[in-house]
Amino acid sequence: MLKALELAGFKSFADRTRFDFPDGITVVVGPNGSGKSNIVDAMKWVLGSQSAKSLRGKDMSDVIFKGSQTRGPAGAAEATIIFDNTGGQMPVDAPEVHVTRRVYRSGEGEYLINQQAVRLKDVKALIRGTGIGIDAYSLIEQGKVDRMLQANAKDRRAIFEEAAGISRFKAKKVEAERRLERVQTNLTRLGDIVDEVATRLKTLKSQAGKAERYRQASDRLKELRTVVAWNDWLTLSTELNEATTQLEAAQRQHRKADTLRESLEEQRQAAEMQLQTIADAAREAEQSRSELSGEIARIGGRRESDQTTLVEQRRTLIGHYRRLRAMRTEAGSAIADLRKTIAALEVAEAELADVQQKKESIAAKRDVEQATVHRIESARDDLQRDHLAAVRRVAEHEANRGRVAQQMREAARALEEIARNSVTAEEGLKTALRDHDEVARNVSELEKRITDAQREVEIADAKVCETRRVLERRREEIGSLKIRLQGITERARVLDELQQKQEGVSGGVREVLRMSNAELKKDLVGIVADCFSVDRQVAPLIDAALGPRSQYVIVRGGSVSDAISRGDIKIGTRVGIIRLDELPNRRPGDKIRLDGLAGVIGRADKMIDCEVELEPLVRHLLGNTWLVDTLATAIGLRKLSSAGLRFVTASGDLLDNDGSSVVGPPGGETGLVSRRSELAAAKSEMQHYSYQIAEAEKEVGRLTGVVDSEAAELGRHEQAMRKWITEHAAAEAKLHHVTERLSARQATVDELKRSSASHTELLATAKQQDGELAVSIQKGKQEIETLEAQRTEVDVQLTAASEQLREVQSEAMSISVEAARSEQRVESLTIAADVARRDQSQREAANQEVRDAMTRTRERITEIETRILEADNRLAELMIAMESADAKLQVLAAEANQEREATRRVQTESQAAIKAVAKATEAVATISSARDAAALKQSTLADRIAEDYQIDLRNDEPPEELAEIEDRSSVDEEISRLRGQVQNVGSVNMEALEELNELQVRYDELHGQYQDLTAAKDSLQRVIARINADSRRLFLDTLEAIRINFQKLYRKSFGGGHADLILEESDDPLEAGVEIVATPPGKPSFSNSLLSGGEKALTAVALLMSIFQYRPSPFCVLDEVDAPFDEANIGRFVTVLTEFLDQSKFIVVTHSKKTMTAATTLYGVTMQESGVSKQVSIRFEDVSEDGQINAA
């Protein structure tokens, strides 16, 4: 299937190069660094590798030829794999399939199939299920053999999935799962919509019935209210004209008094501004002083911590000094003991040499004496053989007895020596026991210290963790506060924009507020809603109480009204105007007090903050309005109190003083007063949250410092624990050494005891033998008494010679025993000297360790002392700066006192002027009260009718046939009844009937879509289940077939052994990993990581060929896979490859000549030009043993 590979500008292949791959084994050879492996990299790159690292580069531009000494760099890299598709294996209608990848130096890249641009997804789809791919078994590069065995089981299963051909199923499954997820999301969303529409449909069916009843009652109510409104409007117009004339005179007097008050107010404001300037300067100075104080506290805390650490380090240094002195004392004693031992050893060795010389001398003397005895015995034998026989028997008995006596003496001497050695050994054992107990106690004490240190570390670590948890909670709180602040800020911004744009204010009012006439602007105060400050919770009630009057323009005289009348100010809609100079002094109901009654919240004007100038206006507008909890409370209070009071309930219902009421839920728009109050509240909350965030951030800073401090404390505890652990390890090593010495001493004592028992037994046996020999000798003497006379002289000579021989033998035996003792003493002293030398070496190492610790401690002390000195200098500078800040604060305090005194003087004069204004205002209020009452009633009536029925009482003419009301009470009763009927109907959707039909159609359509999505979901779930079942079956069948092939090929490749593939236990085989077990012949079972390089490679090759045997890949690339093989394994490797040539073709990159012998096609790659790879034709004999290509 693989036909050729073409390269152009790819890595070191600067020129266009083509490699044809005919059937069989194609071998690529060349020296190291010639670019052979770039052929494998090119194949991986074309097949979709996205990792520059796997291509042995830093980024993808590294695949482009970089140039050489004689060539410039290439602008692009290109590689093409050509597949033979005459059999139609690939889903492309062409005899050849060219898969090309190209990348430009600009970073752009492209994939092409038969010169048509495609996506990487299309390339992967083309080769999926064929065994071809960068992660499949068709590309085995350097190092991948080892990774195939050492990879985890789940990563390794990808190779078997490719062999089973289920990778395409996995892609389909992933796509189906994505579609299922989208369907489920849409199904959930559509289900919510269907439920919502169904609920709305049910509601509309109920609303349609209400709509008809509401229409009939509202039409009759409109008819009656219109007639009543026109009659009331005409009556109120007459009253209003009379009140206006009386008000103008009083307003002129009010303006004079107000001018003086404004002048004094300007003086007071100037003084307050100066006082504010001084206060700002004082705050800045106080802030600077606070920062200096904080810096002093921080540096002082750090200095105190350093001082504590310095004391601890000095204590540590003193401890090191004491330990060093103790170790030096101990070392001096040990050196003296070592010298004594060496001296004793030298004396013992000299004594041993002297005894050896004596032993040799006495041995020669013994030989001489034995020769003399033999000569005498020979002469005696010649005289009388019979006598000699008797004498021989006696002599033998005596000799035996002498030997027994000698054994007895030797045993006695040995027992004496053993007794002496036992005393010495027992003393050494006691000393070793004392040393062992002392070191064991030291180890136990160190273990206790380590346990204490571990407990301290755990406590410190718990403190650090707890503080960090608190710190994280504080940071989360800051995040939550910032989110709240952001929401409130956004709401405030929207409200501010509405306020700036004057949303909700009628066009005529905006035109009046935007007028440019400076003279007229002097009389303009603003609209009612903008001049009040009220709590946000009460604001909706004030909006309800004011009604349209919240948009009334407040003026100080009649110039604005005159300008509107003259046409100087052009307005598009009607404008309500309130003149401060014409307000009445009192209104009906001002003096009525309902405070403290059940259900009463308070009087409306008392809920408002405003400037002093506007207080009469507030009393005028709201002085007769009371806020109560419910409508029932309002009705009850109206019956108890006199007429003239208005009531507003907590839900926004209004019970007016004329008996009318406005009830029901408020509209969706926020009132002007509510909006202004909400904006003020939002700004206040912004300040509140900003303060909380600042405080929380301070707390975070503090906690961060605490964490650092606690972490440092934890570090100190851990350092102490490490110190005790180090000492404990040294003590355990010493304990081990002492234990070994104790064991040796105990073994010596035990051996001496066994030797003593043995010699005691030998002595008893010898005594028994001596008694028996004495009896035998006595009998022999009696036998030879008759013969002694004849041979007396000979016997005397023989006895004398024998005695001499026995003496010499006894002396020789004594010298031998002495020599044995000397040798034993030399050996004992040699062992003692070796032990002392080892102890001395260990003491010197411990001594050096303590000196190193002292050096580190001194350096730490110097560092801390330097920091303390720097902190002292900085504290002095900060104290000077703080004194300067205190002096500045004192100066500012004196200036502030002067300004406050000036402000008090101006305020006194201003209060007098305000009283004069108030007196004039009261006069104006008294006169204008009647007018305002009529105007308010008229305006409220007009606004209510305009709002309810779009009838303009102000501009429209009364109907010509206006009916007169003969029985007003019956009409009011009918209106009240109709109102109740309309209200009882509740909220009515007049468009319910039309909307009902449209909604029914939409519901039917959505319900059908929901059923379609449900069916699609079921279908996708069935598809995924079928894919899982097919994949599971294919995977298990494939794994079992490959497993059988692997077992056979492994035994064939290794000449025996055992190998197996094991599927890990899992609920789903598709999620289980695959383990490889390989045991070469003659070796025990062990981990794959312990296999040799050759065994790993041959095992991987056997596995690879097992996969090929089950599902042949069109080709297989092996990049220096045979590098770890010896000659025998290469032969097996080549044999395995040749067996699969009828199923696939192989491209092998190698240095081995034995592998080259199996090649049907041989390519050489060299760098005849530096940095540029070139394909060359070679012969087998042109390649050296190390893969070098010899020049022709």
Swiss-Prot record:
Disulfide bonds: none
Species the sequence originates in: Rhodopirellula baltica (strain DSM 10527 / NCIMB 13988 / SH1)
Positions annotated to bind ATP: P31, N32, G33, S34, G35, K36, S37, N38
Protein name: Chromosome partition protein Smc
Listed Gene3D superfamilies: 1.20.1060.20, 3.30.70.1620, 6.10.140.1720, P-loop containing nucleotide triphosphate hydrolases
Entry's transmembrane regions: none
Subunit structure, as described in the record: Homodimer.
Free-text note on domains in this protein's UniProt record: Contains large globular domains required for ATP hydrolysis at each terminus and a third globular domain forming a flexible SMC hinge near the middle of the molecule. These domains are separated by coiled-coil structures.
Keywords: ATP-binding, Coiled coil, Cytoplasm, DNA-binding, Nucleotide-binding
Record function comment: Required for chromosome condensation and partitioning.
Gene name of the encoded protein: smc
A Pfam family matched in the record: SMC_hinge
GO CC terms of this entry: chromosome; cytoplasm; membrane
SMART domains per record: SMC_hinge (SM00968)
NCBIfam families found in the cross-reference section: SMC_prok_B
Keyword Coiled coil attributed: yes
